[in-house]
Amino acid sequence: MANYTAADVKRLRELTGAGMLDSKNALVEAEGDFDKAVELLRIKGAKDVGKRAERATAEGLVAAKDGALIELNSETDFVAKNGEFQALADQIVAAAAAAKAADVDALKAVKLGDTTVEQAIADLSAKIGEKLELRRATYFDGTTETYLHKRAADLPPAVGVLVEYTGGDTSAAHAVALQIAALKAKYLTREDVPADIVANERRIAEETARNEGKPEQALSKIVEGRVTGFYKDVVLLDQPAVSDNKKSVKALLDEAGVTVTRFVRFEVGQA
């Protein structure tokens, strides 16, 4: 008896881009363990596995002000374009900056006029007739640079980047914010990547190389090369600079005398 459902197959196909048969086989091999099935498809080379699996379903916007960055979600893009919804987001991010609210729970409790942020969201949700959610919020108290990106001209910003830095000038910091928005770095340095994630990438790289029939004596070099490629995908300082791909982001920052201390990237609909 199958230990997975048709819905599991459909979800796995949507998340990974794999075909129906490959998805079924992965679920069988994983004995119904969904996360294991995703990993098996990665090893076997399914297109875009991992990247598509990060997606979540949501609409809404991101907003930034004076070291604060928030993501406010709606159910539809129709509401995301609503003037009252956008005005509320502006009020919330201003309140976040003023209160230096570093997370969602802290921000929900912040006063907004005669009410709280949490109640203001609930009130507008009841008025519009659609679920609204303050999904993410952060605040950096150092020198910061922000960048907001729209997916379409008639929609509010869907990608927001907040960078905290020291030294240099705003042009270098702005270039880094653009870099993070475009290439989706997750970590600042290699040391910031959790050891279990690196170990898993190394294991997947080795199993993939073996499945490809690579010679045993070459495996170590191949694995290290693929792990280095993984770092270039997810570590900001290791990434090739968008403005000059012959240099790393670290090299360009060193030239500009800028040190990035931390950053965050919010994208509507992204896990």
Curated annotation (Swiss-Prot):
Q: Which SUPFAM superfamilies match?
A: Elongation factor Ts (EF-Ts), dimerisation domain, UBA-like
Q: Name one Pfam family in it.
A: EF_TS
**Does DNA repair appear among the keywords?**
no
| GO molecular function list | translation elongation factor activity
- Record region (Involved in Mg(2+) ion dislocation from EF-Tu): 76-79
Q: Which UniProt keywords apply?
A: Cytoplasm, Elongation factor, Protein biosynthesis
Database matches in InterPro entries: EF-Ts_dimer_sf, Transl_elong_EFTs/EF1B, Transl_elong_EFTs/EF1B_dimer, Transl_elong_Ts_CS, UBA-like_sf
Q: Where in the cell is it found?
A: Cytoplasm
| A GO cellular-component term linked to this record | cytoplasm
Return the CDD domains for the record. Answer: UBA_EF-Ts
Q: Hey, which family's this protein in?
A: Belongs to the EF-Ts family.
Query: What is known about what this protein does?
Result: Associates with the EF-Tu.GDP complex and induces the exchange of GDP to GTP. It remains bound to the aminoacyl-tRNA.EF-Tu.GTP complex up to the GTP hydrolysis stage on the ribosome.
PANTHER family referenced in this protein's UniProt entry, alphabetically: ELONGATION FACTOR TS (PTHR11741), ELONGATION FACTOR TS, MITOCHONDRIAL (PTHR11741:SF0)
Q: Know the name of this protein? A: Elongation factor Ts
- Species source reads Mycolicibacterium vanbaalenii (strain DSM 7251 / JCM 13017 / BCRC 16820 / KCTC 9966 / NRRL B-24157 / PYR-1) (Mycobacterium vanbaalenii)
Gene behind this chain? tsf
